[in-house]
Amino acid sequence: MQIATGKLSGGGRPSEDRILTANDATLVVVLDGVSTLTDDTPRGGWYAQTLGEEFIAVHDRAQHLDLRTTLQEALTRVAGEHGLVPGASPAATAAIVRQRSHDHMVDALVLCDTPVVIEKHDGFEVLRDERLETLVRLSPHRDVMVEQLRAGGGFAGPEHRRVVQQLREHQMQHINQVGDPLAYWVAEATPAAARYAVVRSWPISDIKRMWVMTDGALAGIESYGLWSWAAFADACTAVGPQQVVDAIHAYEHDDDPSGVKHPRYKVSDDKALACIDFRPTA
């Protein structure tokens, strides 16, 4: 695995996105930290960093474990060591790619809206967890937000801040709730959430490249349409992932600073992008 990364804060504060890799470059962990509604100081970045480091530590000790079990163990340890309580803990989305050298397989895990994109010899595949997106799409608050932004209300006004707060509160009612048909699952102080992660495995011979990205980077392709997946793949190779996330950020600020074209929560979200190349080096 050859790994290249790009990261960028959405602006005005440190990024809460994280990319971590194992020392032997066979494991990539990408997380999008989420602070609680009541945090005076944002803790999402701290949580993402701490969980990512713990995941790698658990993996290094027990590489035979599947990714769900490894994540569950890491969640248990972080919650226990730091006294985190469900519903009042910072959280993180997570996406993980692991190369298993002993049997020439590649594993991927996705929990919440941080996808993994796979370029195989016959095309592209996106491994995603759509439960949060489905929940948001069903909320009437989302429709209000879209209408306000398309009408030119912008991101700075009290109306936008109010509806975003309502959306967050709506989401919190359904986070990590067993038996809730609208539940979505995220890394937080409920270790069992790991059992609900989306997982896949492929023979390494089937894969050319993979990309792991937070939703801020994904928006450049699926929301803004700046590239097709094939063009995005070529751009990552030609100019590198840092210039790709820079280009997405520039588009948001230069071409749609008020969210009229593409309604969203804020002008720019944090962005993290890891590019993984499995092709033999020359």
Model regions: which residues?
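PP2C/PPM-type serine/threonine phosphatase catalytic domain
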Residues: 1-282
